Structure formats: C-alpha cells, structure tokens
C-alpha cells in the first residue's frame, strides 16, 4: 500500500535589525517570493503573509513578542519537497544575503495532525 505524502506547512517570521531600511525589507520580501516562484513544483501555492497587526491579546501573565517585521506561511507538497527546497543553492544564497540583516528568525514547520498533534 502506498502512502500519500502529507503537505508540510512552514510559518516564518523575521525581525530585522534596527538599521535595516524599509527598502531593504521590501527587497528581502521580493527575494523570498522570487525563490518560491522558482520552485513552484515543490509548493502547494505561493506564500501568503504580511506585516503584523497590532491585535490585543488580553491574556493573563503571557508575554507577547510584538516586534516582528514580516511573516508568511507556505505549504510544501511533502517533507521531501521541503528538504529539497532547503538544500537548493538559491536558498543558501538567500540566507547568506539576508542573515546579516536579521535580529531574529522564527521558523516552524509541521505536518497537519489531528487534535493539533496531541
């Protein structure tokens, strides 16, 4: 019996250094989209995302990190596709160009699971 590969969803958020200009942030966003455009065979659809909204949470004793500059979600066709994307030369080059501009990165990859995995 053959198993159907599960899509892998990636959530990525970026906090740029304070010295990074809006133009540089826009350039990095275009670079990310360009890389995904080159590898549409590995993804379900192009990434979606944007700048954060200032949504009040009103949670007790919960710290909220509100200084992200950019975030997006993308779904890969499978774990194999995600691994292939991460190994692409263009991905490595993009990281080399972008990492010096970043203060912090959050990347969370997951396969959809019943009851959120628990």
Set out the residue ranges of the language-model regions.
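Short S/T/G/P-rich N-terminal loop/turn motif that feeds into the first structured element of a domain
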Residues: 1-70, 77-84, 110-118
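Short, compact, well-ordered microdomains
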Residues: 73, 82-104
């Amino acid at each position: 019996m053959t198993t159907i590969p599960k899509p892998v969803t990636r959530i990525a958020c970026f906090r740029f250094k304070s010295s990074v200009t809006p133009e540089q942030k826009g350039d990095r966003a275009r670079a990310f989209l360009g890389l995904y455009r080159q590898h549409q065979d590995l993804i379900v659809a192009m990434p979606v995302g944007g700048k954060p909204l200032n949504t009040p949470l009103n949670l007790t004793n919960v710290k909220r990190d509100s200084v992200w500059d950019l975030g997006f979600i993308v779904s890969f066709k499978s774990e194999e596709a995600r691994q292939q994307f991460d190994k692409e030369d263009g991905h490595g080059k993009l990281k080399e160009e972008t990492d010096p501009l970043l203060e912090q990165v959050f990347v969370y990859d997951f396969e959809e699971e019943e009851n959120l995995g628990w």
